[in-house]
Amino acid sequence: MYRSHFIADVTPEYDGKEVIWAGWVHLLRDLGGKKFIILRDKTGLGQVVVDKNSSAFGISQELTQESVIQVRGIVKADKRAPRGIELHAEEITLLSKAKAPLPLDVSGKVKADIDTRLRERVLDLRRQEMQAVIKIQSLALKAFRETLYKEGFIEIFTPKIIASATEGGAQLFPVIYFGKEAFLAQSPQLYKELMAGVVERVFEVAPAWRAEESDTPFHLAEFISMDVEMAFADYNDVMQLLEKILHNIVKTIKEEGKEELKILNYEPPEVKIPIKRLKYTEAIEILRSKGYNIKFGDDIGTPELRILNEELKEDLYFIVDWPSDARPFYTKSKSENPELSESFDLIYKFLEIVSGSTRNHKREVLEEALKKKGLKPESFEFFLKWFDYGMPPHAGFGMGLARLMVMLTGIQSVKEIVPFPRDKKRLTP
């Protein structure tokens, strides 16, 4: 047995009892003939005291920062110590000695730039701030799944090696598939639509890939996509579902991630339901009134979104009813005005974190939409053929996990948030 208790589980009530801790040497200090070890495990930090006359003192002299040790000792309640207790070591076992000096200071006393942090990533991830990010992400995914399970959704897994582009775009990574050209999936879009035509309500959490040329704090070549598709629904239905999901995610993190938020010194924004809905045409008018030369059909970029954020005075808002020509072929146009689509983006301040729409569920409409986009319907026959056999009206959305984490942690770069980011410059670690 390597440990009897995690550090955070030992309280002053354990005074006088023997416990075994295991973890990493976070900090070392010599003071008045005693050795103080700040030990770290997944639950936090704890103080170990090694007296000079202890049999453990000799080995404590060999320890380096980030060495992995096991400590058997007696708990002593002490209000001055972290968590109100310290462990007086009777035996220390060195399980793995770390090289010295470290290429990156895990304690955070010496700051490192982002390139150093990404190069020495595993040490960087051991920092308390990064462990807090990892734990908050886990809580977000837990709340996402729990909300959808309660709403009757089924978790699915779709192919990640595909024959053609999901949206007809050029940002594809080609792979050789048994002598044929195939691609890494940009999105589970087409397959999740087909699955909505099977079990009605589906979701997936999985990686997706885009040959992303943009070198910004918010773009990656590989990312985790949180996808939802819902039969017998339109874009208003899935926006309401998304509001519920986000509300539950933030609530879960505030309730179960208090320590992590404290470490990050951050509080996620409240999700006020209903989230404000701004029509695309209204957004264009606001931007024109601010001197922007923007015309119908233009995208709304980051500078423009910053202006909208200032004007609306809302951290979270939907931009709805985008021009049909600006959306993918599977997006349904509004019946009363085909120039507009039943679509939405959810914006956090100036960052798009979710995109969704009502989908086209009739084959002939899809074929026309493909042709209009300059795509060949025959290239999508694997998808279109199933619309001959009763495809229900449906709607859905995709949410980028790393971008959602910007909102949940306050960290302004997805490259810092993702444990091992992939962009144009990085393929390792």
Curated annotation (Swiss-Prot):
GO terms for molecular function: aspartate-tRNA ligase activity; aspartate-tRNA(Asn) ligase activity; ATP binding; magnesium ion binding; RNA binding. Binds 3 Mg(2+) cations per subunit. The strongest magnesium site (Mg1) is bound to the beta- and gamma-phosphates of ATP and four water molecules complete its coordination sphere. SUPFAM superfamilies: Class II aaRS and biotin synthetases (SSF55681), Nucleic acid-binding proteins (SSF50249). One of its GO terms (biological process) is aspartyl-tRNA aminoacylation. InterPro entries: Aa-tRNA-synt_II (IPR004364), aa-tRNA-synth_II (IPR006195), aa-tRNA-synth_II/BPL/LPL (IPR045864), Asp-tRNA_synthase_2 (IPR004523), Asp/Asn-tRNA-synth_IIb (IPR002312), NA-bd_OB-fold (IPR012340), NA-bd_OB_tRNA (IPR004365). Keywords: Aminoacyl-tRNA synthetase, ATP-binding, Cytoplasm, Ligase, Magnesium, Metal-binding, Nucleotide-binding, Protein biosynthesis. CDD domains: AsxRS_core, ND_PkAspRS_like_N. It is an enzyme of class 6 (ligase). It is found in: Cytoplasm. ATP binds at residues 210-212, 352, 400-403. Gene3D superfamilies: Bira Bifunctional Protein, Domain 2 (3.30.930.10), Nucleic acid-binding proteins (2.40.50.140). Mg(2+) 2 binds at residues 352, 355. The record marks 82 as: Important for tRNA non-discrimination. GO terms for cellular component: aminoacyl-tRNA synthetase multienzyme complex; cytosol. Its EC number is 6.1.1.23. Homodimer. Belongs to the class-II aminoacyl-tRNA synthetase family. Type 2 subfamily. This is Aspartate--tRNA(Asp/Asn) ligase. The lineage of its organism: Archaea, Thermoproteota, Thermoprotei, Sulfolobales, Sulfolobaceae.
